[in-house]
């Protein structure tokens, strides 16, 4: 019988029968900026489908990730990874904090994608952290930071092209990485998920927002937008 190991805002981790494997289940929960939790019926099923599809695509271009296989509508089998305590945020368009903190016009397109690191902590409200701090805290080595940056940009470039192909703009995405040990050596591995829960996705022509950005003001449209994204990706 599988044992619950951890429950986050939108996913639950369970033990698996084999060592170094886990079961990741996608729930319908979503957390608003106010901290209130809401349920979007069917969201977890769509996120499982979308993330499984995208992780498979990334594996095909040589990006090591924790996804092994989809078990059922809500669950997938994943590799255990020692997850880094940071998130990597890549943005190609002014949105979110760039509008609030820098006064940029929403939708302004950057010459090159901008990369930020944030502490992976809801308790501390995901503060920005720089490379010098990451090194001094002992969270990653310099080589690991370099590898994470290279992989993150490669992932963002690939996903941007994939989404453009289905009429969607990848405005921003949040990526998480970790290390997997093979004897004394370790490899960097992409973890978590890639879905409308952690990507800002806009219609490429109208800039109409899709995914999690609808939660605050148009929650009734959330499922429909996730479904649209899943259906568009089926075309690839």
Swiss-Prot record:
Keyword annotations from UniProtKB, A to Z: ATP-binding, Ligase, Nucleotide-binding, Purine biosynthesis
Which Gene3D superfamilies does its entry note?
Answer: ATP-grasp fold, B domain, Phosphorylase Kinase, domain 1
Q: Main EC class of this protein?
A: ligase
- Give the CC-aspect GO terms: cytosol
Q: Which domain of life is it from?
A: Bacteria
Catalyses: 5-amino-1-(5-phospho-D-ribosyl)imidazole-4-carboxylate + L-aspartate + ATP = (2S)-2-[5-amino-1-(5-phospho-beta-D-ribosyl)imidazole-4-carboxamido]succinate + ADP + phosphate + 2 H(+)
GO BP annotations, alphabetical order: 'de novo' IMP biosynthetic process; cobalamin biosynthetic process
Which terms does the record give in the GO molecular function aspect?
Answer: ATP binding; phosphoribosylaminoimidazolesuccinocarboxamide synthase activity
Tell whether ATP-binding is among the UniProt keywords: yes
Q: Which family does it belong to?
A: Belongs to the SAICAR synthetase family.
- Can you say what this protein is called? Phosphoribosylaminoimidazole-succinocarboxamide synthase
Which organism was this protein described from? Answer: Rickettsia canadensis (strain McKiel)
């Amino acid at each position: 019988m599988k044992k619950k190991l951890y429950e986050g805002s939108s996913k639950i981790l369970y033990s698996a029968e084999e060592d170094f494997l886990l079961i990741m289940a996608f729930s319908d929960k979503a957390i608003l900026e106010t901290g209130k939790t809401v349920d979007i019926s069917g969201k977890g099923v769509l996120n499982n489908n979308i993330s499984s599809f995208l992780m498979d695509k990334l594996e095909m271009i040589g990006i090591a990730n924790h996804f092994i296989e989809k078990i059922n509508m809500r669950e997938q089998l994943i590799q255990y990874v020692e997850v880094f305590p940071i998130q990597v945020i890549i943005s190609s368009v002014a949105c979110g904090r760039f509008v609030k903190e820098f006064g940029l016009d929403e939708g302004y397109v950057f010459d090159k994608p901008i990369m930020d690191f944030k502490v992976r902590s809801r308790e501390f409200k995901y503060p920005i952290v720089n490379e010098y701090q990451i090194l001094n805290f002992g969270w990653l080595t310099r080589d690991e930071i370099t590898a994470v940056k290279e992989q993150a940009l490669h992932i963002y470039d690939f996903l941007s092209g994939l989404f453009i192909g289905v009429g969607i703009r990848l405005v921003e995405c949040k990526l998480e990485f970790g290390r997997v040990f093979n004897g004394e050596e370790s490899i960097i591995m992409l973890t978590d998920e890639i879905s409308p829960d952690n990507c800002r996705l806009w219609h490429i022509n109208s800039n109409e927002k899709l995914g999690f950005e609808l939660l605050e003001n148009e929650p009734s449209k959330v499922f429909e937008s996730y479904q649209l994204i899943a259906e568009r990706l089926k075309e690839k």
